[in-house]
Every structure is written in C-alpha cells, then in structure tokens.
C-alpha cells in the first residue's frame, strides 16, 4: 500500500467524525521517520506485536506535540470518566464493594439525632377510652407508664410514622444489612428489585409495605438479624415461609407483628415491664421477637397456610397481653433437632407481669 493511499484511508475515517487527520498532528521528525513509515498500514490491534508502542514511547528526541483539538480533549475527558462511574442506587445497580453492617443501636441513634418533630405531631401515645371502658381500664388495667419513659415511648411511635427513604444512607444500610443477614449474601443488593419479593415483601419496593408501621418495622427486622440468637430464629422462620405448602410472606408477616407491638404499647400492655426495666425500646423489641416466634410455632404445629394468615394475625392481635405465656420458646419448636441452650429465651417474666 502506498503512502498516498494510506493517507487517503486515514483522512476518510476522520471525515466520518471518528478522529482527526494523523498527518495534521505529526511533526516533521515523525514524517521522516522510516520505522514509523513502515508500519502505517498495520492495524492498531497489531501494534503490540510489532513493538510499535515501544518505538512511540522510546523515540522522543526532537518530538514536539501538535495542537490538540477540542474534539480530542472532549474524547479524553469522556475516557477518563469511564473509570470513575459509580452505580446509582435508584438505577437498581449494586456496588461490588459490600457496605458495612449497621447495628440496631447505630440505626436507633440516627433517629435520636435527626429532627422528627413533623412526624411526632402525628402520634397518638395511648388509646383514648371513654365511659365504662375508661373506668374498667382505670380499675383493672395495667399501670400507666412512668413519666420519665414517655419520651422513649413517643420515639418508638414517631419512628413508626417515618417512611423508608432510599436516598438516606442509613436507611439503605439497614435494608442491606437485613438482606445480607437473612440470605447470607456477601454483596450489597439493589434497594429496589424482585429479590425483595423473595424475602416476603409484596413488591420490588419495600417502602410500599410499611404502612402503619413505618421504619419501625425495618428496625425490628434489623434487631432480629443482628443478634446471634434471634438471627438463627429468623433464618428458621424464613425457611418455614418458603415451605412448599405452608409458605407465607416473611417480611410482610413481620410488618404485621410490628403493628401488633405498636398496638400493645399504645394499650399500655407493656407498661409494667417497661417501668420495671426502666426502658421501653428493649421491651418492645423482645415483645416483637417473642410474638414472631409464637406465630411461627403456631404456623408449623397447626399446619397453617397462607389462607389462615388473617385468622392467625387476628388471634394474635385480639389481646396482646395473652402473649405473656409465650416465653421459654426455642427454635426446637421450629426445628426437630435439639436447640442449643443459648437459644432458649425467657420472655415470660416480661409479659406475665404486664397483665396483672
């Protein structure tokens, strides 16, 4: 191939808008360089096989850079951006670098430090009773919550008014931790996607299933998976939820149990134990975990199916104080294999006092 024909082919490519003319960017010293002239007809993919790259980098004496066009600068900037592109959470693409787990206390601290005043206005701390119901509750009902614990109770109810914000890093870490702990995955996942349906949400966006419970439902799931004892319990219940006959939506069931816990708190069923322990959040968490375990035990032993879910939840929610007897359950009730001693909980002491 002659030099003229080669130059014609190169300039034709440039006219198509791909690159500029090479001849316009070469210095006279390069045009006179015999070694380079010999390789003009070699495809770019073959340069590495002929030592061209070494020639271009080693023979720099007398070389003066030509004028760089605006198109060349723009192409260079676009190329440099390639290595700095990061996945967008909303696009559903997950990062290959897994994020750190977030503990329950760290997530709770987030809500203790942000301004929740707009959400707090919506809460109703206790059930408003009138007439005979108010009199009966006053005479025979549980004690009132100590005044020093009312702020902590209000925080729990306020968190239940907060929705899931996928743009909030803390909210995202909570979701990622729940997913990875339940599935055993080592990598983060998209915050929206069909994989959430596998865990028992109704759709691809977990936020749509949190009505009536808000972010408290996710905090309860986080509490369940971040403790070594309750994590094993959660994984057993998750396996039960995937049973070919007794299957049920795991996360959606958890949300409903959070709703029962909120109702128990507002009805002051947990006040006695909260007063005794001088804490509210740990008592609510224990009540949630014990109720979930009780539901799973009922589900397995009574051979319930998804058609029974409404009845089972109604039975649990009719009188939360009846759950005082669910203590001392273990995953042995979910698994025929003997459960380790550390998997046995004593929730009964907490709730037997709550109904007296």
From Swiss-Prot:
Occurrences of domain ELMO (ranges): 170-324
Keywords recorded for this protein, A-Z: Cell projection, Cilium, Cytoplasm, Cytoskeleton, GTPase activation
Localisation: Cell projection, Stereocilium; Cell projection, Kinocilium; Cytoplasm, Cytoskeleton
A Gene Ontology term for the protein's cellular component: stereocilium
Tissue: Expressed in the cochlea and in the organ of Corti, as well as in the supporting cells, including pillar and Dieters' cells (at protein level).
Entry-linked Pfam families: ELMO_CED12
Gene Ontology biological-process annotations: auditory receptor cell development; cilium assembly; cytoskeleton organization; gene expression; protein localization; protein transport; sensory perception of sound; stereocilium maintenance
Disulfide bonds: none
Role this protein plays: Acts as a GTPase-activating protein (GAP) for ARL2 with low specific activity.
PANTHER family in alphabetical order: ELMO DOMAIN-CONTAINING PROTEIN 3, ENGULFMENT AND CELL MOTILITY
Name this polypeptide is given: ELMO domain-containing protein 3
Organism: Rattus norvegicus (Rat)
Gene designation: Elmod3
């Amino acid at each position: 191939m002659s030099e003229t024909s080669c130059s014609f082919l190169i300039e034709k490519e440039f006219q198509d808008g791909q690159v500029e003319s090479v001849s316009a960017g070469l210095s006279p010293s390069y045009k006179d360089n015999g070694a380079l002239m010999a390789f003009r007809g070699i495809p770019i993919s073959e340069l590495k096989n002929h030592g061209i790259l070494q020639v271009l980098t080693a023979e720099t004496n007398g070389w003066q850079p030509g004028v760089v066009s605006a198109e060349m600068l723009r192409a260079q900037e676009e190329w440099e951006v390639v290595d700095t592109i990061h996945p967008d959470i909303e696009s559903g693409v997950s990062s290959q670098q897994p994020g750190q787990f977030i503990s329950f206390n760290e997530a709770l601290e987030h809500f203790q430090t942000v301004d929740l005043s707009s959400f707090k206005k919506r809460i109703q701390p206790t059930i408003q009773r009138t007439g005979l119901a108010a009199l009966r509750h006053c005479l025979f009902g549980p004690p009132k919550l100590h005044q020093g614990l009312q702020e902590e109770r209000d925080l729990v109810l306020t968190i239940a008014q907060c929705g899931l914000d996928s743009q909030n890093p803390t909210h995202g870490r909570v979701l990622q931790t729940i997913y990875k702990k339940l599935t055993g995955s080592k990598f983060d996942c998209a915050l929206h996607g069909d994989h959430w349906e596998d865990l028992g949400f109704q759709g691809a966006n977990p936020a749509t299933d949190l009505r009536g419970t808000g972010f408290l439902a996710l905090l309860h799931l986080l509490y369940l998976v971040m403790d070594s004892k309750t994590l094993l319990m959660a994984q057993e219940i998750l396996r039960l939820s995937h049973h070919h006959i007794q299957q049920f939506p795991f996360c959606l069931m958890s949300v409903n149990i959070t709703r029962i816990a909120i109702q128990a708190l507002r009805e002051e069923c947990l006040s006695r134990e909260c007063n005794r322990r001088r804490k509210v959040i740990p008592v609510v968490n224990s009540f949630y975990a014990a109720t979930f375990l009780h539901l799973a035990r009922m589900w397995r032993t009574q051979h319930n199916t998804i058609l029974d879910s409404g009845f089972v939840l109604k039975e649990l929610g009719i009188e939360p104080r009846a759950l005082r007897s669910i203590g001392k359950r273990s995953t042995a009730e979910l698994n025929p294999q003997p459960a380790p001693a550390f998997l046995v909980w004593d929730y009964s002491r907490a709730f037997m006092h709550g109904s007296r």
